A protein has these predicted regions:
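Cofactor-binding beta-sheet edge motifs in enzyme active sites
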Residues: 1-169
Length: 169
């Protein structure tokens, strides 16, 4: 499985689940194979805050970048196990595969190799920042009654609609 250390605090935004889903999609595994460790100031990376959709965009991009690094690292380690060069292998469906020979090793085998008699641990860290926060799209509508003589405004109805885009969680 994969361990995901994040600095975002899940305050009802669902970021733990969203980021685990993003890792699972990038690493081509089940979300059940992802353990999320978040908001531990002794161990977690810095995060500017968990609010609106910014965690999905900003921290999610960092997760994607870390997955890209990890795949390359896993390909290097997997190539050692397969006795070939990293250029000869690909990351496919959670395995390191040599398409020319059809041989493959699992992510679990790569993880074990990285921890036993190896000078390279299978781990990756990435950061991502954005100069602007992604804008939310929202509209609010109000129906009022106006007494033109007194200026009294009475709110009869109010509706707000937020476009969340494509829901991830």
């Amino acid at each position: 499985g994969y361990n995901l250390l994040i600095g975002a605090a899940d305050m009802g935004t669902g970021c733990d689940t969203i980021l685990a889903q993003m890792l699972a999609e990038n690493m081509e595994c089940s979300v059940d194979n992802v353990a999320v460790f978040g908001a531990d100031t002794d161990a977690s990376p810095y995060d500017s805050g968990s609010y609106a959709s910014s965690t999905t965009y900003v921290t999610g991009k960092a997760v994607e970048l870390a997955c890209d690094k990890l795949k390359k690292q896993m390909c290097r380690i997997g190539a050692q196990l397969l006795g070939c060069t990293p250029e000869e292998v690909e990351f496919q469906a959670g395995k390191i595969v040599n398409p020319a020979t059809g041989e493959s090793v699992t992510a679990a085998q790569v993880g074990c190799k990285s921890q036993l008699n190896s000078d390279e641990a299978a781990e990756a860290t990435a950061s991502h920042a954005s100069p602007v926060s992604p804008p939310p799209f929202m509209v609010g509508m109000v129906e009022i009654e106006l007494d033109q003589l007194t200026g009294l405004v009475t709110v009869l109805d109010y509706m707000a609609v937020v476009d969340c885009g494509i829901p991830i969680n």
